[in-house]
Amino acid sequence: LWMELKMNGCSFPLAELSDGTVHLLLLLLLLNLPRKRGMSMLAVDEPEMNLHPAWQKLMAHEILRGESFKQCFISTHSPDFLDEFTQDFLEGHVNVIVFDPSSKRPLRQLDRNELRNELQNWTLGDLYRIGDPLIGGWPQ
């Protein structure tokens, strides 16, 4: 089996690509499977790993437009990646679950109505960057 990336008239064997690029290509392959052969659920742990922030945005957009799955669960620590889900979160297309180890219930779904005012001028990633108590994020 031989796979390569063709871009701008050049061919690159997968072995010569970065880990992040290979992961991105494999996820894009999964996201673009025909619906009838697709998955009922896609779970991805830290899809932003080894990716430039610009590629993280591309990956987020591809996940949002993906039609090869019915549900998608993503675990991330990247505010840049999280930024891209703000509008879909506000519109009710995306739910965000926060891990809070200090709580009796460590998994909590964010309430979009509770964050609506803050998200007028900020993104989910912004709130993560400043360690907003509702969303958690970077330690203070």
Question: Language-model segments: what does each one mean?
Answer:
Residues 2-139:
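Switch/communication elements of ASCE P-loop NTPase nucleotide-binding domains
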